[in-house]
Amino acid sequence: MLYLLPLSVSCRVPGSPPAPRSRRFLDPGGGRGVGDGLGGVRVFRRRALRGTDVRSNTSSSSSRKGRHDDARHDGGYGDDGDAGALLASVRRLLLSGSAQDDAAEGEAEEDEQGQFPKRWAIVFLCFSAFLLCNMDRVNMSIAILPMSAEFGWNPQTVGLIQSSFFWGYLLTQIAGGIWADTVGGKTVLGFGVIWWSIATALTPFAAKLGLPFLLVTRAFMGVGEGVAMPAMNNILSKWVPVSERSRSLALVYSGMYLGSVTGLAFSPLLIHNFGWPSVFYSFGSLGVFWFSTWASKAYSSPLEDPGISAEEKKLITSQTTGGEPVKEIPWGLILSKPPVWALIVSHFCHNWGTFILLTWMPTYYNQVLKFNLTESGLFCVLPWLTMAVSANFGGWIADTLVSRGLSVTTVRKIMQSIGFLGPAFFLTQLSHIDSPAMAVLCMACSQGTDAFSQSGLYSNHQDIGPRYAGVLLGLSNTAGVLAGVFGTAATGYILQHGSWDDVFKVSVVLYLVGTLVWNLFSTGEKIID
């Protein structure tokens, strides 16, 4: 048992030389000194509180007497009552000080635990980036009407302008993934947002200069948005643990859906009150504000962030790669893996149906359901809202299943099967429905179940190759964009020679092919390191 005694107390054995006055606390039983002044006090205060060396001051009076006798026997002090009182006072001081120290440490821990998780701040910034992404993408679909009237564009020219975005968007998917994986997602996503925001703001000037300038500006906008998605995937692979992966990705992608809703809602108001250029100026300026926050608050990985707590960093790095950007892309290894091709094929099958519905839906509402343009525009918003809600609901389900012990592979297959078979089922019902209200409901349900794909194939890039998540998304999304381009064009051809039922049948067949390929070849395990 350890007892603390200040040697400044006169407690020498008769005949012995006087003890030197010192502030060092010693073990009267012959132990070494452990510190001078307040440093020693702090050491023993901590020991006292933990109960490893000093008993609690709530001990009985008999125990205190026994300790007093032990110390006297060891030559600690004589029968002087003042010395005993002093010792008791010192011990009480040590224990009370230790309690205060621990209380302060506890408050610090509570403050740290109460801090908003940095990883979710990164997720929210990505969410807001993709909100702006689709706001800037859909504004042209509204502004093109007054622009066509002002500049005298025919339908063929309008189609050329609308497609010019995809020139840049398609070409930068893989390039953006390589760039993000080798440099870091922060730089690439920041570049993408500021680049497409500047291109958006310059659109009115380009339109007035002439058609070639407008086409180049829209292609430049596609370049910015093309690198954004692979960069986001790279960032989340570093920041989000697997137990939260589905929810985080669902939230970010729901930003795209809500961005479409916001853009479609505010563009007509701005055009009506301030003219069509105001849409591009206002939406483009928002990206500049976002970039200033991103540049000062975001980091490519938690290892680079000096402000993240040690507890959160440990949580993240225990479930993610969290490492430095890669130096080389192992293309041979990546392209030799069947799960990678399952991603590519499934992404193509998924986007064929999705792009057709979102691109041709206003026409379907107008020609088949006989809605006027105002009603068509209103009902076009409904699927986007449904997708935003369903994506987050599906993400919560997926993460819950993983946390309860279901394998990631099983969860990804379940969620993507819903994302394929749900739309396939509801599209087959459209040919049997006469009520416009039921047709709109079927469309909404089709897109709502489609959004479960965010917890399926869209989460799988980070599962199978977290270090190359940007490249993997670039590969699969290139196939997805091609599906959108070819599917949109093929739909026009099918409608010219067939019917809407034929359009939906092609989509259903591809959904079934995607389901088969996904369940046979996909995995949730890491296969590329």
Swiss-Prot record:
Segments of skewed composition (Gly residues):
28-39
Q: What's in the GO CC field?
A: chloroplast membrane
* Record protein name field: Probable anion transporter 1, chloroplastic
Q: Give the originating organism.
A: Oryza sativa subsp. japonica (Rice)
Has UniProt tagged this entry with the keyword Transit peptide? yes
- Molecular function terms from GO: phosphate transmembrane transporter activity
Q: Which SUPFAM superfamilies match?
A: MFS general substrate transporter
Q: What does this protein do?
A: Probable anion transporter.
The annotated regions of Basic and acidic residues compositional bias extend over 67-76
InterPro entries per the UniProt record, alphabetical = MFS, MFS_dom, MFS_Na/Anion_cotransporter, MFS_trans_sf, SLC17A9-like
Q: Which PANTHER family match?
A: SODIUM-DEPENDENT PHOSPHATE TRANSPORT PROTEIN 1, CHLOROPLASTIC (PTHR11662:SF446), SOLUTE CARRIER FAMILY 17 (PTHR11662)
* Keyword field contains Transit peptide: yes
Q: Where in the cell is it found?
A: Plastid, Chloroplast membrane
Q: List where the protein spans the membrane.
A: 120-140, 158-178, 187-207, 209-229, 251-271, 274-294, 340-360, 378-398, 418-438, 469-489, 503-523
Q: Where is the transit peptide?
A: 1-55
Its topology with respect to the membrane?
Multi-pass membrane protein
Coiled coil where? none
Report keywords, A-Z.
Chloroplast, Ion transport, Membrane, Plastid, Transit peptide, Transmembrane, Transmembrane helix, Transport
Q: Which family does it belong to?
A: Belongs to the major facilitator superfamily. Sodium/anion cotransporter (TC 2.A.1.14) family.
What biological-process GO terms show up in the record?
monoatomic ion transport
User: What Gene3D superfamilies has UniProt attached to this entry?
Assistant: MFS general substrate transporter like domains
- Identify the stretch(es) annotated as Disordered: 13-39, 52-78
